[in-house]
A protein has these predicted regions:
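Conserved nucleotide-sugar phosphate-binding/catalytic loop shared by glycosyltransferases and other
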Residues: 11-13, 31-68, 138, 147-151
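Active-site-proximal region of nucleotide-activated glycan assembly enzymes
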Residues: 104-152
């Protein structure tokens, strides 16, 4: 796999992680994929791949934003991915931001759970990401594209 381009895939646990795993499975033959998650339990589902853990945070508990940002920056410098791809949530915004600061492609795919509007993180990501996708056609406006859904 040494000659395959690298991708850094980031998601929190639950639906975000399941959707990211489906994307990674579709890309595994063409890319070397490393993973980042805010939940250490995700490590066991990606054995054989490099895995990095970042701390979870929310708007109500923002204490890990700065340390996580520097860890994301470190991961991107170390891994040298061609692109960062994420299905969210908030901690993964930092990977997208770090990727853009390092002149890497950053792809945000908003969760399929967001039927009526983009997630709060998705709204922020739409201003940072080089590519932004929704899984609902009605939410595709401007820079935000619809290309189908991951679970369908």
């Amino acid at each position: 796999m040494d000659n395959h381009p690298k991708i850094l895939a980031c998601a929190s646990i639950g639906g975000h992680w399941i959707q990211l795993q489906r994307i990674a499975n579709a890309l595994k033959d063409d890319y070397e994929i490393s993973f980042v998650s805010s939940n250490e339990k995700c490590r066991s589902s990606v054995e054989g791949h490099r895995f990095y853990h970042i701390k979870d945070f929310t708007r109500k508990n923002p204490w890990w934003i700065i340390p996580n940002f520097f860890k994301c920056l470190y991961i991107i410098i170390k891994e040298k991915p061609k692109a960062v791809i994420t299905t969210g949530s908030a901690p993964c915004l930092l990977c997208i931001l770090a990727a853009r600061l390092m002149f890497k492609k950053a792809i945000w795919i908003d969760s399929i759970a967001n039927v009526e509007r983009l997630s709060t993180s998705g709204k922020i990501a739409s201003k940072i990401a080089s590519r932004m996708y929704t899984q609902w056609p009605d939410l595709a406006v401007g820079k935000i594209k619809y290309a189908g859904n991951i679970l369908g």
